[in-house]
Amino acid sequence: MYTTLIFNSTLMTMFTILTAPILTTLNPIKPNKKWTELWVKTAVQLAFFTSLIPLFIYLDQGIETITTNWQWMNTNTFNINISFKFDQYSIVFIPIALYVTWSILEFANWYMHQDPKMNQFFKYLLLFLITMMILVTANNMFQLFIGWEGVGIMSFLLIGWWHGRANANTAALQAVIYNRVGDIGLTLSMVWFAINLNTWEMQQMFIMSYNTDMTIPLLGLTLAAAGKSAQFGLHPWLPAAMEGPTPVSALLHSSTMVVAGIFLLIRLHPLMDNNKLILTTCLCLGALTTLFTAACALTQNDIKKIIAFSTSSQLGLMMVAIGLNQPQLAFLHICTHAFFKAMLFLCSGSIIHSLNDEQDIRKMGGLHNMLPTTSSCTMVSSMALTGMPFLAGFFSKDAIIESLNSSHLNAWALTTTLMATSFTAVYSLRIIYLVMMNYPRFQSLSPIDENYTKTRNPIKRLAWGSVIAGMMIFLNILPTKSQTMTMPTHMKTAAIMVTILGVLTAMELTKLTSTQLKITPNVNMHNSSNMLGYFPNIIHRLLPQTNLYLGQKMATHLTDQTWFEKIGPKGILALQIPTTKMINNSQQGLIKTYLTLFFLTTVLFTTMTMI
């Protein structure tokens, strides 16, 4: 009993610690710049160490609880409670999110030190984290929706932080609009649950849906996850989101916004267990996403955009795990992915800052001599991303591909996922080769220095996580689904073989700059990849242009010509003109015409009287 009390109280204390810096901003006295260091970073750091207590209790005793704090709303047939669900998923995810955010906040202290609104920036980052915590620990759909909308609005504010830049404003609007599409799916699903199941409590939903056809609400949930986690069709906002400051990109892509959609499906996965249509949809959608975005990453030259596309590719892999009916593997990949993706963004931010805001990898090179720590950590995170054995990404990526390999599902999903895994190795090695190796390809700069503890310490902490976190999580989390225990050697080594194939391909491509096989290379495939499959041009340019053209035609032709000219006053005028012309022609003073008309009228009248 006392263990359960300690378990619940420490988790609620963690929320209190995180909200304390927000409450201090209610003071009308403006805080100084040390507020970010004294309050925000310290609060997240303290909350992380506090969250380790329930984590160790869970690992030791397996305790999972649901804490109901108060009743939000009560009607005759419908209750909404504010309750927190502390189970395997939330207890493991919370320390990881806090650890990653702690590193990002410390890095942001150095990265944003010249920003005049630095305190507000840190407050937004903290609110971003809190809303994600609310989403992760929610025990009902109403509370989950609060966290869902919270991460959405905070992402809009943070992506468009530098609102003086047109690209940042456009990226923020894209994020909101695409997420609105997903929000429609979640809202309609919640309405369906309220009408048909009469509850938003997750445990009651799982029980009452046992003999119910859940296809319609699950399609809404899939749409919601596709919007929030940037699946194919709703993906363009995620690469554009890198227009925000680098700490925002690191937090957004690692442990908050983009994994919210996948986490929604993990949390509500008991509803999907026996629905083959939804599972197949998730599998094919994830496979298509991971291949398409990995192919787009191959030809990008902006270092942050390459990393952003890699995030979208990994989200597709998580969706594949959902479609395989293995939600614990998707969750494992969320946890391991957070470490090396945050480190990749922090390393890229350090490099960009050192090179006077240069983001083109073609203008870098030779940084392993000038930034040895950053270069080493970039290499570690890139290898973890490719699934190098015994790094963090290996334990989750390899498990997903093994599960896909041994399942009796379509070969198309397996083929596309393996191709995407190979592409991951190609663009990761491309970053390493063009940024770290060879000679510098940039102009002479002031001496480059990375001897700042606020730069090195966060990156080193995340590097440790990228090395050992995968094994620690893999060994301590019990699977919720039965896993394949034996398989042939060729299936077991398929993932690492396609990764090696990708590395060899990338090494071969680096030599083709001097020994090209074709004088005029095929630019169609390159342009298709570089321009994201022409998707933004079609969706963001062609469709609005067509709508504007049709609107203009309707306004000028349909409204003006039809209503004003054909039906309105000009229409009446047009009807009267022929009659007027006929009368006018008969009244022109022509004697012969008058006599002829008189004669014809007289003859006609006489004939009629005689009859």
Curated annotation (Swiss-Prot):
Which keywords has UniProt assigned to this entry?
Electron transport, Membrane, Mitochondrion, Mitochondrion inner membrane, NAD, Respiratory chain, Translocase, Transmembrane, Transmembrane helix, Transport, Ubiquinone
Q: Which domain of life is it from?
A: Eukaryota
User: What does it catalyze?
Assistant: a ubiquinone + NADH + 5 H(+)(in) = a ubiquinol + NAD(+) + 4 H(+)(out)
Q: Does the keyword rRNA-binding apply?
A: no
Task: Offer an example of a GO molecular function term for this protein.
Answer: NADH dehydrogenase (ubiquinone) activity
Q: Report whether Mitochondrion shows up as a keyword of the record.
A: yes
Its EC number(s): 7.1.1.2
List the membrane topology term(s).
Multi-pass membrane protein
Q: Which GO terms describe its cellular component?
A: mitochondrial inner membrane
- What is an annotated GO biological process for this record, any one? electron transport coupled proton transport
Q: Which InterPro entries match?
A: NADH_DH_su5_C, NADHpl_OxRdtase_5_subgr, ND/Mrp_TM, NU5C-like, Proton_antipo_N
Which residue ranges traverse the bilayer?
A: 3-23, 38-58, 91-111, 121-141, 142-162, 175-195, 205-225, 246-266, 277-297, 306-326, 329-349, 375-395, 417-437, 462-482, 493-513, 591-611
Name of the top EC class for this enzyme? translocase
| Location of this chain's protein in the cell | Mitochondrion inner membrane
Q: Which NCBIfam families does this one have? A: NDH_I_L
Per the record, the similarity remark reads:
Belongs to the complex I subunit 5 family.
Task performed by this protein = Core subunit of the mitochondrial membrane respiratory chain NADH dehydrogenase (Complex I) that is believed to belong to the minimal assembly required for catalysis. Complex I functions in the transfer of electrons from NADH to the respiratory chain. The immediate electron acceptor for the enzyme is believed to be ubiquinone.
| The name this protein goes by in its record | NADH-ubiquinone oxidoreductase chain 5
